[in-house]
Amino acid sequence: LIQNSRARVRRETIVADVRVRAPSVDVRTVGAGGGSIAFVPELTKALRVGPESAGAVPGPACYKKGGEQPTVCDANVVLGYLPSDVQLGGKMEINRDASVMAIQTLADAMGIDLMAAAEGVIKIVNESMFGALRLVSVEQGYDPRDFALVGFGGAGPLHANALGVLTDAWPVIIPPGPGVLCAYGDATTQVQDEAARTYLTMASDLTDAQLAEDL
């Protein structure tokens, strides 16, 4: 969350079971991306998405790199959100037939039609992303309606409008080159160093001169 041109920072981060006591930008991750695998458990017959991912290799079925499991990317292709008549990066072709075959396995498992299955995948992943947005806004005391929503990353713009509707955030902004926005920021942002140390003393003994001398 960015307010007054400054990103929110937290002093410690928990990675798995490790508490990292170092300042970092307050980022909340969610196991939902273009490569997240959708599946229907035999026991519940309820559609689920992620956290397992097909990654870049073998990737979604539409990449034709060996991946056959249905992913969020394949659902976007089936629904036409990701056109199959364009080349990713000017080189990679999208195979819609492969996406249809992958998503059809979900439809057959749930006894619904192809489009309904694809829509179900997208609705689930949008709700997962919405939950992450709530963590950095509503649960921190901020109203998302007071902010614009920026969609970036490889698949972010595909879901940005739906998330704008869910959060009532306006406007929804898609920056130029959304797939490389993080890399661009990493290359151009100013480096900031911080240092801290513990200083123990009695308040009655503390003076400006003593503090300057000790530190």
Where are these regions (language model features)?
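N-terminally biased helix-coil "hinge/interface" segments that flank
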Residues: L1-L215
